[in-house]
Design a protein with these regions (language model features):
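Conserved beta-loop-beta/alpha segment of the NTase-like Rossmann-fold superfamily
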Residues: 65-143
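Acidic donor-binding segment of Leloir-type glycosyltransferases
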Residues: 33-60
């Protein structure tokens, strides 16, 4: 089946994105050769100006800077992306949406491409990245941890030291979760477009609101989430 992905780099909600990081990640996204790349500046900030001067397409939707219109909407990246795509791509030309957080450190172009590999399974609705976690990170509630089941026979062709897996749980507090091992989740996502719309319609779970744990919404509603285990980090 032919796919037509779009990469969306989101400017942080507070508008306090690092202009250099936004520009660099836009350049890596372009180098990946996946398809259309836009910077979603739904806050109407100036953080993406450096990338714009370098040739990036910065999309400032009509609702830029407006607060959510209903009491169940959150500041989650998925809702922001879905809301902007509803106008930017209202005819659904793009069937895969790759959401890259602008505050991430520099990453290799092949890493962005690799996030789509779990979607080769037609029952996986979206995918993300996980990396080995340090002891300090494991104890920090600021970091989302993932429990995964690795598919031993599935590897990512563009990244030799990586494996395809399926996520079985997300948590911030290991003390309240089941047995590990745990991995650090990296906030890059590849959504099937229909699954993204469904994800947003579900609305946040109580646990998501309490722990700021957006990916939990998918598992709580029976959506399968794939993962790519990066053993070499984002700059692989």
């Amino acid at each position: 089946m032919e796919i037509n992905p779009i990469i969306v780099i989101g400017v942080p909600r507070d508008g306090d994105g690092d202009p250099k990081a936004i520009k660099t990640n836009w350049q890596r996204a372009q180098e990946s050769g996946i398809g259309c790349v836009i910077i979603n500046d739904d806050m109407g900030s100036k953080a993406a100006n450096a990338a714009k001067k370098a040739g990036a397409y910065v999309y400032v939707p009509d609702h830029a800077g407006e607060p959510p219109k209903s009491n169940y909407e959150t500041d989650s990246g998925a809702e922001r992306v879905a809301r902007s795509l509803a106008t930017f791509d209202r005819f659904y030309n793009h069937d895969i949406v790759i959401n890259v957080h602008a505050k991430l450190p520099e990453m290799a172009a092949d890493v962005i491409k690799a996030v789509m590999y779990p979607l080769a399974d037609p029952y996986v609705m979206f995918s993300t990245f996980v990396v080995p976690i340090s002891k300090e990170e494991a104890q920090s509630d600021d970091i989302i941890k993932a429990q995964i089941e690795i598919h031993p026979k599935r590897r990512v062709q563009v990244l030799t030291n990586s494996q395809v897996a399926e996520v079985t749980g997300f948590t911030r507090k290991i003390s309240e979760a089941g047995p590990g091992p745990y991995y650090k989740q990296i906030p890059i996502y590849a959504y099937r477009r229909g699954a993204l719309d469904k994800f947003v319609r579900y609305g946040p779970t109580v646990r998501e609101m309490e722990e700021n744990l957006e990916p939990d919404r998918a598992l709580a509603n029976g959506m399968r989430v794939g993962a790519v285990l990066l053993n070499s980090g984002l700059d692989a």
